[in-house]
Amino acid sequence: MKKAVVLLSGGLDSTTCMSVAHKAGYELYPLSFDYGQRHQRELEAAKAVAQYYKVKEHRLIKIEHVGGSALTDASIQVPDYTEDGQIPVTYVPARNILFLSYALGYGEVIGAEAIFIGISSVDYSGYPDCRPEFLQAFQKVVDVGTKAGVSGQTIAIKAPLLYLSKGETIQLAAENGAPLHHTTSCYRGGEKACGTCDSCTLRLKGFAEAGIKDPIDYVNQGDRSCFSTPLED
């Protein structure tokens, strides 16, 4: 069976991405990261998602000394959602470069054909490492800088959500039976999602767009009157 490394944070997007890889017939090798993020609950979610798919191995990589972000530095406040067009303080320096590099090394070892990453350039927070040009550049690195690449057996970087809105992503998750009830998206990392941070707001807007009820609990839920049937467990 063909193998794929899946970058699994425990959030909505990475879990949907996992469902896409599963449906495509890949043997799944999820990779999660503890980089000192304040929302440690996502690691619990990632474990639950991996168990749901009965994967052979779920690896957790610890990366120390990652800073300069509201997600890793308690002295920087996580802001509520804004649309000012600026790169927000929740940007983690070089995060996807680090994650993909680890996934690439792991992928070469296990003989993976693909690496799945759940990034989107549509409904996203403005992070530069979530854009198509970033993925194209990293694929070039894979092609010219690895044994697999130069021998003609390159590892494909797949981002199936890249051009999907959050609502379209949620619809895809529902179609694939993705376990979104296990996921968390909140940057603040409380027992309940805050409902007002950038990530929560995009998630709630997506469920509203999809006409599907979000299966997780929020402190501030906003107007959810347009939601209909919840995703099934």
From Swiss-Prot:
Q: What is its EC number?
A: 6.3.4.20
Which top-level group of life is the source organism from? Bacteria
For whether the record's keyword set contains Zinc, the answer is yes
Q: Which GO terms describe its biological process?
A: queuosine biosynthetic process
Swiss-Prot/TrEMBL catalytic activity: 7-carboxy-7-deazaguanine + NH4(+) + ATP = 7-cyano-7-deazaguanine + ADP + phosphate + H2O + H(+)
Mention any Pfam family matching this sequence. Answer: QueC
InterPro entries per the UniProt record, alphabetical: QueC, Rossmann-like_a/b/a_fold
Q: Which GO terms describe its molecular function?
A: ATP binding; ligase activity, forming carbon-nitrogen bonds; zinc ion binding
In this chain, Zn(2+) is annotated as bound at 186, 194, 197, 200
Cofactor, free-text remark = Binds 1 zinc ion per subunit.
Respond yes or no to whether keyword Metal-binding is given for this record: yes
State the UniProt keywords alphabetically. Answer: ATP-binding, Ligase, Metal-binding, Nucleotide-binding, Queuosine biosynthesis, Zinc
Q: Which cofactor does it need?
A: Zn(2+)
Q: In which pathway does it act?
A: Purine metabolism; 7-cyano-7-deazaguanine biosynthesis
Task: Output the CDD domains linked to this UniProt entry.
Answer: QueC-like
The entry marks the following residues as binding ATP, namely 8-18
**Primary role:** Catalyzes the ATP-dependent conversion of 7-carboxy-7-deazaguanine (CDG) to 7-cyano-7-deazaguanine (preQ(0)).
Q: Which family does it belong to?
A: Belongs to the QueC family.
**Whom does it interact with, and what assembly results?**
Homodimer.
Q: Tell me which PANTHER family the record gives.
A: 7-CYANO-7-DEAZAGUANINE SYNTHASE (PTHR42914:SF1)
Protein name per UniProt: 7-cyano-7-deazaguanine synthase
Q: Which organism is it from?
A: Desulfitobacterium hafniense (strain DSM 10664 / DCB-2)
